[in-house]
């Protein structure tokens, strides 16, 4: 058995064919012609040692961190870009100063920039009771807002009830009137009495309180009239009140039930509105705004007289 460090008998000898010993082992002249590269005089070939090998090339470092030369823009292009950026910066600074100047002018004139935030899914109006109304008036304002939403709910249900009556043969005129009530009633209530009350609570203005009282009385009268719905316009069936409900319950039970529900909604809205105007009037008198309003009215009358 061969030892671990014995030579391999099948391994080829590491012999340099150009050495003298290799020529001696070959036993004389080779039997083949070398062609154009054959040298008859082997002494002209430089001698090499028998154990010499070809020296390997030195290892080259891997070019992982090598940089790639990227041609940079010329100094002229850099200057042009720098000028362009400076011009843009100057334009932005000019716009910022102009916007700041307008905001300051609006603030001096008492103009408040309001961001639309309600309803959340489709902002149409600015409404922020928590941050804009004093804490001791927020409960009153929330109830007034509930009365505004209650009016919208009443008019919407009125459209449903009148539509059911129209389908059962009561005529299209009452349906058109119900649509007019809804389309004009909700925005009109917001502009005529809810927004004045909101601004009066926020700014504590006696004049805006007076406007609210004047319009809100008509709102209460309309709710009471709608709850009764006397046969004044088109037999009163354009409003879901108690009288048309009694008349329709005998003809069609479903339509009569719709009208009775409308009657209940208008009753609740009337009671809620009466509570709101009572609370607002108590605050108005208790805060001295009533006396202030009287003084302002007297001054206005005297100026008009002179």
UniProtKB/Swiss-Prot annotation:
Keywords: Cell membrane, Coiled coil, Cytoplasmic vesicle, Membrane, Transmembrane, Transmembrane helix, Transport. GO terms for cellular component: early endosome; plasma membrane; recycling endosome membrane; trans-Golgi network membrane; transport vesicle membrane. Residues 1-60 are annotated as: Disordered. It holds the Pfam family SCAMP. Residues 72-109 form a coiled coil. Its main location: membrane. It is found in: Cell membrane; Cytoplasmic vesicle, Secretory vesicle membrane. The keyword Cytoplasm does not apply. It comes from the Eukaryota. The keyword ATP-binding does not apply. Residues 44-54 have a biased composition (Polar residues). One of its GO terms (biological process) is protein transport. It is a multi-pass membrane protein. Residues 25-36 have a biased composition (Gly residues). Probably involved in membrane trafficking. Belongs to the SCAMP family. PANTHER family: SECRETORY CARRIER-ASSOCIATED MEMBRANE PROTEIN 1, SECRETORY CARRIER-ASSOCIATED MEMBRANE PROTEIN SCAMP. This is Putative secretory carrier-associated membrane protein 1. It comes from Oryza sativa subsp. indica. The lineage of its organism: Eukaryota, Viridiplantae, Streptophyta, Embryophyta, Tracheophyta.
């Amino acid at each position: 058995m061969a030892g671990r460090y014995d030579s391999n008998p099948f391994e080829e000898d590491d012999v340099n064919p150009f050495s003298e010993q290799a020529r001696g082992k070959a036993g004389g002249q080779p039997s083949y012609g070398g062609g154009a590269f054959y040298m008859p005089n082997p002494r002209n070939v430089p001698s090499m040692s028998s154990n010499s090998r070809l020296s390997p090339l030195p290892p080259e470092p891997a070019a992982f961190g090598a940089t790639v030369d990227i041609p940079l823009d010329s100094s002229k292009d850099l200057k042009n870009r720098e000028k362009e950026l400076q011009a843009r910066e100057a334009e932005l600074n000019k716009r910022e100063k102009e916007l700041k100047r307008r905001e300051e002018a609006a603030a001096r004139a008492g103009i408040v920039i309001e961001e639309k935030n309600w309803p959340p899914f489709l902002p149409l109006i600015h409404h922020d009771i928590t941050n804009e109304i004093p804490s001791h008036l927020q409960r009153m304002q929330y109830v007034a807002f509930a009365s505004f939403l209650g009016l919208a709910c009443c008019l919407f249900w009125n459209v449903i009830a009148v539509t059911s009556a129209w389908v059962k043969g009561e005529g299209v005129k009452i349906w058109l009137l119900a649509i007019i009530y809804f389309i004009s009633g909700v925005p009109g209530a917001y502009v005529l009495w809810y927004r004045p009350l909101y601004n009066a609570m926020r700014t504590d203005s006696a004049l805006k309180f007076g406007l609210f009282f004047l319009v809100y009385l008509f709102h209460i009268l309309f709710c009471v009239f709608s709850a009764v719905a006397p046969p004044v316009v088109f037999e009163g069936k354009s409003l879901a009140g108690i009288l048309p409900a009694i008349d329709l319950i005998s003809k069609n039970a479903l339509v009569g039930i719709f009208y009775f529900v409308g009657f209940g909604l208008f009753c609740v809205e009337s009671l809620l509105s009466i509570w709101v105007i009572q609370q607002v009037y108590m605050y108005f008198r208790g805060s001295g705004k009533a006396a202030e309003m009287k003084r302002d009215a007297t001054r206005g009358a005297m100026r008009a007289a002179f």
